[in-house]
Curated annotation (Swiss-Prot):
It holds the Pfam family Ribosomal_L6. It comes from the Bacteria. GO terms for molecular function: rRNA binding; structural constituent of ribosome. The keyword RNA-binding applies. The keyword Cell inner membrane does not apply. Part of the 50S ribosomal subunit. Keywords: Ribonucleoprotein, Ribosomal protein, RNA-binding, rRNA-binding. InterPro entries: Ribosomal_uL6-like, Ribosomal_uL6-like_a/b-dom_sf, Ribosomal_uL6_a/b-dom, Ribosomal_uL6_bac-type, Ribosomal_uL6_CS. Belongs to the universal ribosomal protein uL6 family. This is Large ribosomal subunit protein uL6. PROSITE patterns: RIBOSOMAL_L6_1. GO terms for biological process: cytoplasmic translation. This protein binds to the 23S rRNA, and is important in its secondary structure. It is located near the subunit interface in the base of the L7/L12 stalk, and near the tRNA binding site of the peptidyltransferase center.
Length: 177
């Protein structure tokens, strides 16, 4: 029995869901998203409640049951509130500037890094040392934030680089005399 899968997903006001076959489409104030489940589960919409049930009790069906329920819950959260990842830049001369769908990064290289932001995600820079990635697709927001962080991940000696807000960087001592 999946403890996650057996909980139904409630649809808040202003959000609608429609099921056709194995695909559920959720529409809300921030946009629309869809998810196609495997044949191991059945998705049903009753009023403002979405419930997922397994078609059998095989190990795969139970795994897909909990995963499908979480994916539908993420669809609902995305179209109502959206998802957000915040990044901090640490280092002398390291800064970021968002211009349209391009993020310009000065990260100590001999050239500026121009990062093109994909559709469905918005990137803003409230300060030169902060980057905010927002969107309705949790996976895409996390992927864009990870790609930005990849350009200069934090190093353990001085802590310079791009880190997630609140991320702990394990620090090392330098050489000892």
């Amino acid at each position: 029995m999946s403890r996650i899968g057996k909980k139904p997903v409630e649809l808040p006001s202003g959000v609608s869901a429609a099921v056709s076959g194995q695909t559920i489409e959720v529409k809300g104030p921030k946009g629309a998203r869809s998810f196609t489940a495997t044949d191991d589960v059945t998705i049903t919409v009753d009023g403002n409640v979405v419930s997922i049930t397994p078609r059998g009790m095989s190990k795969r069906a139970r795994q897909q049951w909990g995963m499908s329920r979480t994916m539908v819950a993420n669809l609902v959260a995305g179209v109502t509130e959206g998802f957000k990842k915040e990044l901090e830049i640490t280092g002398v001369g390291y800064r970021a500037n968002a211009q349209g769908n391009t993020l310009k990064l000065n990260l100590g290289y001999s050239h500026d890094v121009d990062f093109t932001v994909p559709a469905g995600v918005t990137v803003s820079t409230p300060k030169q040392t902060e980057i905010v990635v927002e969107g309705i697709d949790q996976q895409q927001v996390g992927e864009v934030a990870a790609k930005i962080r990849e350009w200069r991940s934090p190093e353990p000696y001085k802590g310079k680089g791009i880190r997630y807000k609140g991320e702990f960087i394990f620090r090392k001592d330098g050489k000892k005399k």
